Amino acid sequence: MKECVPVKTFESLFAELTERAATRPEGSGTVAALDAGVHAQGKKVIEEAGEVWIAAEYQSDEQLAEEISQLLYWTQVLMVGRGLTLEDVYRHL
């Protein structure tokens, strides 16, 4: 596996999403996702989880990694939408 420098880490993504929720920049897809509510966010989590499974079964590692990144994004959007912190989740790991 080749080494790469991450553009974002799990923690930095969460910080970015939390900041966008607070500052609500115009035209932000994250703000739109948060405004759509927990039901819509949950549907995206389920959709992305299914795409992760399909990618794991039938697609390349690169495609799988991309699908996992989208699942992590939508999971964090849902967390922010519900007011959870990383620490709330880390307590259960």
From Swiss-Prot:
It catalyses: 1-(5-phospho-beta-D-ribosyl)-ATP + H2O = 1-(5-phospho-beta-D-ribosyl)-5'-AMP + diphosphate + H(+). Its EC number is 3.6.1.31. GO terms for biological process: L-histidine biosynthetic process. The keyword Nucleotide-binding applies. GO terms for cellular component: cytoplasm. InterPro entries: HisE, PRib-ATP_PPHydrolase-like. The keyword ATP-binding applies. Keywords: Amino-acid biosynthesis, ATP-binding, Cytoplasm, Histidine biosynthesis, Hydrolase, Nucleotide-binding. Pathway: Amino-acid biosynthesis; L-histidine biosynthesis; L-histidine from 5-phospho-alpha-D-ribose 1-diphosphate: step 2/9. It comes from the Bacteria. It is found in: Cytoplasm. Gene3D superfamilies: MazG-like (1.10.287.1080). GO terms for molecular function: ATP binding; phosphoribosyl-ATP diphosphatase activity. Pfam families: PRA-PH (PF01503). Belongs to the PRA-PH family. HAMAP family: HisE. This is Phosphoribosyl-ATP pyrophosphatase. It comes from Rhodococcus erythropolis (strain PR4 / NBRC 100887). The gene is hisE.
